[in-house]
Amino acid sequence: MSETKKHWENVYRNKSPDKVSWYQQKPALSLSLIARARTPRDAPIIDVGGGSSILVDYLYDEAYTDISVLDISGSALAHAKTRLGNKADELHWYEADVTCFKPPHRYAIWHDRAVFHFLTNKLDRERYVNVLKEALEPCGQVIIMTFAVDGPRKCSGLDIVQYDADKMTAELGEGFSLVETGHDIHHTPTGNQQKFAYFRFRFTAEAG
């Protein structure tokens, strides 16, 4: 088991999902960005680092029918499956490190709230982008949220990389066109504020 996996398994085994700093009662921004992507309800969507997030509950209730969740922590996924009950059987679950993920098919939307900013190693970021390119349909869209350049420098005790639009565009490289970007304030369960930046890109490269 990698050190990264050990860290996240420990987090989800020792904290309730609604006590972690990134918990949202309703992921309003994510839902809005996905809606603005204007993909059909049967288009495949993957929530990268989704863990125990309730985003999938809302997507299910809004009649999206092809939902996948990827997370390195099996404990996090178990929380989500338990919460969803029988609905969980209608979703696709993947326990894997995103930098090593082998997409079973291509997706219309790739959603990542606060995974990419944990990749402090350049090689890991390059691997992530390679997986992203393999995973997206032509003209598919990627939604990434990270701490902003004036936001926190750590999350869950780990160092992170802060981003703005120029920096994120440079990381993704050729084949991605920025559609929109902005900022958001997240309020943690303990009442702290965290400054996020969000980015929505369209994949402009042809599928290989």
Give the residues covered by each predicted segment:
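Conserved acidic residues
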Residues: 108
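A conserved beta-strand element that flanks and buttresses the S-adenosyl-L-methionine
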Residues: 111
